[in-house]
Structure formats: structure tokens, C-alpha cells
């Protein structure tokens, strides 16, 4: 797993780490029960504070993506398909909200948006 962070991003560094690990889990790049780098090792590799990595790991654990075993390390949690579905559904919702906002500004009707969605689902676009 290769995590690339950007100091110029508006997204906090711990969020970038969290998102990269989540994406690796969802895409199956990281397998169930696979050990993650230790907090300190990842912090050293990324040249950032271990507290930043710890915050990312803590949030991933709270969200059910990883589990930490005292004295052994952090591991990819068994996949909860419902968690993954909720995560992706939220992502879709965010995109739909952006589409809605753009359509309001551009005075695009609901029917026009529905027609575009239908064409996309039918593979016509």
C-alpha cells in the first residue's frame, strides 16, 4: 500500500491517510486480517507526527475498518459489507448534491437531470 499525502490539500493529513487506507480496504488491495504498518513506522515513512497517523487509525477503528490488538498492531477488520455500502452511498449522495447545486445555478430542470441519469444507466452516454 502506497500512501501519498499532499501538504497543499485542503483535506487534513489524517483524513488523507484515513481515506487512502479505506480505499485500499474497499478495493481489496488490503485484505481482511492484513497487518497495517505501525503508527510510528507509517509516521516515519510519511515524515509526519505519529499523532496524525494515530488519529487516522483511531477513526478507522471507530468506523469498523481496522482493529487494533494491544502489543500486536493494527489489522484490517473483517469486512462489514453494510459499512462499505453506507460509505459508498454517502459518497454518491455527496455527488448528487453537487449535481443538484450545479443544475440549480444552470437552470437545468429535474426532468433533464432524470433523462441524463436514464441515459447513463442505459449505457447511452
Explain the meaning of each model-derived region:
Residues 1-35, 41, 90-93, 97-125:
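Extreme N-terminal segment that seeds HTH/winged-HTH DNA-binding domains in transcriptional regulators
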Residues 29-30, 34, 62-71, 77-78:
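Beta-hairpin "wing" of winged helix-turn-helix
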Residues 35-46, 60:
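A short alpha-helical element within helix-turn-helix/winged-helix DNA-binding domains
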Residues 45, 59-65, 106, 123:
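Residue cluster at the C-terminal edge of the helix-turn-helix DNA-binding motif
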Residues 46, 77-86, 113-124:
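Short secondary-structure transition/capping segments
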